Every structure is written in C-alpha cells, then in structure tokens.
C-alpha cells in the first residue's frame, strides 16, 4: 500500500501463464484505476507495430523469372512458395542481414530444415515449416533467401522505388513484416488491495512467432515506451534560448606578452624594437623577416624557434582577424 494518498501504486508482475510455446498470458496488478487501459493500449500498439524482428525480404529461385510463373515438377506456384516463405520464423544473431541457400531434389516436401545455414548465427524456429512440394523425381529446386532485421511492416515498393535502381531479373521482393508478435489482446479486471476495491488488474494475452518469448517482448515494449517518454521528464521552455559558452577566438597563449617567453635580453630587445609585443605578433613573422631585424642573428633566431616549439607554436603561422579588439584597446 502506498504511504500517501497522492502516491501511485506500483504494479508487480503477478503471473506468467505459458499456454503454448509461443503463447502466454501476463498479469500485472495492482494498477490505479484507469491505468490498466492506459498501459495496456500503449503496450499493445508498441508490440504490434514497433518491435524489431526478422523477415525474408528477397528470394531468387533457379529457373524462375518472376513471381507469376510456375516451376515444372513443383506442386505450388511461385506466389504460393513466396507466401510460405513469409510465414517462416527465423532469427539471426550478430548481423543485420544474411543470405541463405536451399537445395532439394526428389519427390517430397521441401521444409525449412532443408535450408543451409550456420547454426551459430541463424536459428530456424519452425524447422518443419513446409515451403513447397516436389512431385517429380527428376525435379530439383534451388533458391537464395535473404533475411533482414527490421521493425514494423515495410512493403517491397518502399525498399526498391528509385528510378535509377534496376531490379535484376529473377530477384523476387517480398513485403516484410518484421514484428515477432502475431496476436495480442488485453483485458482489465478489478483488483483489490486491503480496503481498496477500485483498482485495475491488467492481463495481456500474447502470441509470438517463436523468435522471442512473450515475457521478453513485453520487457522490450516497456523499454521502448519508457525511452520515448524520457523527453517529457525534462521539459524546457522552447522560447528560452540556450546560453552557449563562447569559445575564445584565439589561443590564450597568443595573447600573452613576449616577455613571458623568457628570451635573452638581446633577443627580447630586438623584438620590442620591431613592435613585436605579443606572442601572437611573433608567430606571424617568418624566419626571413626576423633575420632582417637589426642585431638579431641566427643564434637568436634558433633560440626563438626552440622556445616557441616548446609551447607547441611555430613561426609563419597565419592568424585571421589579428590583433583582437582587446589588444587594440590596450
């Protein structure tokens, strides 16, 4: 029970009833009145439309040029084969896409387990799923199957619509339904905590394609909802401009006096005679210009170069907008 009348009850996961391998009922209670429908509807929409998953997006079948054709010795036409492939539950690990191959000959059904794949990165959840039937002993079928990771429903036309794109003959594109959740409904019942009887109990009935467990699906959906709501937690006045810290136009060391370099008296006097008072003035001079300075020889030039190098500076540096206003004012 909450400690204050203004505090909200926090629901807890009461029960997970596993009905089948792919279907489960998840119960949460207690919820404040009305929150059963609020959370139930939000989770339902996310689970149906926003969950990432895997789908077959492209297929190439040897001897087949387009989806409206048939293949001799195969009971199903190409359209039916593609529909059967769309129902295949498959999961890939560590990759966003993978291309699989299937080869089968001889009379009998062609099932998902006939697909050649790396068991370390690919898992076929429904290995006995029928893709087609071979009716002639001399017939064989070979196909290339591309599986991709995505979210929601993506029609083939949106993945291949540019006028500059040329679809290779024989490559068949499928509309991709990535969502691993096949069916979901929720029900809100009355719940009770001590003397309160106006609370909600949320029961979510969900069925997946087997690539994800119902409990994990709800956890991911709740995470997505939480991340989307984070923007509302720290609202700012959109009319109030953000104060950005102004970066100095010049490196502060360039604004320091040449005296800070601790040059020999001879070198320092030569620079002052040429009105070189700031380090920024000095680094813009070239070696040739400094050698033209009266009484400044190669030894003094070497000293100046070494001192500047120790501070990450060098002669002949070009500085835009030099000198700055504050130096001119001084």
Curated annotation (Swiss-Prot):
Disulfide bonds: none annotated. Keywords: DNA-directed RNA polymerase, Nucleotidyltransferase, Transcription, Transferase. GO terms for cellular component: cytoplasm; DNA-directed RNA polymerase complex. InterPro entries: DNA-dir_RNA_pol_insert (IPR011262), DNA-dir_RNA_pol_RpoA/D/Rpb3 (IPR011263), DNA-dir_RpoA (IPR011773), RBP11-like (IPR036603), RNAP_asu_C (IPR011260), RNApol_insert_sf (IPR036643). One of its GO terms (biological process) is DNA-templated transcription. Residues 1-236 are annotated as: Alpha N-terminal domain (alpha-NTD). Residues 250-330 are annotated as: Alpha C-terminal domain (alpha-CTD). GO terms for molecular function: DNA binding; DNA-directed RNA polymerase activity; protein dimerization activity. Its EC number is 2.7.7.6. SUPFAM superfamilies: C-terminal domain of RNA polymerase alpha subunit (SSF47789), Insert subdomain of RNA polymerase alpha subunit (SSF56553), RBP11-like subunits of RNA polymerase (SSF55257). It catalyses: RNA(n) + a ribonucleoside 5'-triphosphate = RNA(n+1) + diphosphate. Transmembrane segments: none annotated. SMART domains: RPOLD. Homodimer. The RNAP catalytic core consists of 2 alpha, 1 beta, 1 beta' and 1 omega subunit. When a sigma factor is associated with the core the holoenzyme is formed, which can initiate transcription. DNA-dependent RNA polymerase catalyzes the transcription of DNA into RNA using the four ribonucleoside triphosphates as substrates. The N-terminal domain is essential for RNAP assembly and basal transcription, whereas the C-terminal domain is involved in interaction with transcriptional regulators and with upstream promoter elements. This is DNA-directed RNA polymerase subunit alpha. It comes from Blochmanniella pennsylvanica (strain BPEN). The lineage of its organism: Bacteria, Pseudomonadati, Pseudomonadota, Gammaproteobacteria, Enterobacterales. The gene is rpoA.
């Amino acid at each position: 029970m909450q400690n204050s009348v203004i505090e909200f009850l926090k629901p807890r996961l009461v029960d997970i009833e596993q009905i089948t391998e792919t279907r489960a009922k998840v119960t949460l209670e207690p919820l404040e009145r009305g929150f059963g429908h609020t959370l139930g509807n939000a989770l339902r929409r996310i689970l149906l439309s926003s969950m990432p998953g895997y789908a077959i997006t492209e297929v190439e079948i040897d001897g087949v040029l387009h989806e409206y054709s048939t293949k001799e010795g195969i009971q199903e036409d190409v359209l039916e084969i593609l529909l059967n492939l769309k129902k295949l539950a498959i999961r890939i690990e560590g990759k966003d896409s993978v291309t699989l191959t299937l080869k089968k000959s001889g009379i009998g059904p062609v099932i998902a387990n006939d697909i050649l794949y790396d068991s370390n990165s690919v898992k076929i959840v429904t290995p006995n799923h029928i893709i087609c039937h071979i009716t002639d002993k001399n017939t064989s079928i070979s196909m290339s199957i591309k599986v991709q990771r995505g979210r929601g429903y993506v029609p083939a036309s949106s993945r291949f619509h540019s006028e500059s794109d040329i679809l290779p003959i024989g490559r068949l594109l499928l509309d991709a339904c990535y969502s691993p959740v096949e069916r979901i409904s929720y029900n809100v019942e009355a719940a009770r905590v001590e003397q309160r009887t106006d609370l909600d109990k949320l029961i979510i009935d969900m069925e997946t394609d087997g690539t994800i467990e119902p409990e994990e699906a709800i956890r991911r959906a709740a995470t997505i909802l939480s991340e989307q709501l984070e923007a509302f937690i720290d609202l700012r006045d959109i009319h109030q401009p953000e104060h950005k810290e102004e970066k100095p136009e010049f490196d502060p060391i360039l604004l320091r006096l040449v005296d800070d370099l601790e040059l020999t008296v001879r070198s320092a006097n030569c620079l002052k005679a040429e009105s070189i008072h700031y380090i920024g003035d000095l680094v813009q001079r070239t070696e040739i210009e400094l050698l033209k300075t009266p009484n400044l020889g190669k030894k003094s030039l070497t000293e100046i170069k070494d001192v500047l190098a120790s501070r990450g500076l060098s002669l002949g540096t070009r500085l835009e907008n030099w000198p700055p206003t504050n130096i001119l004012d001084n």
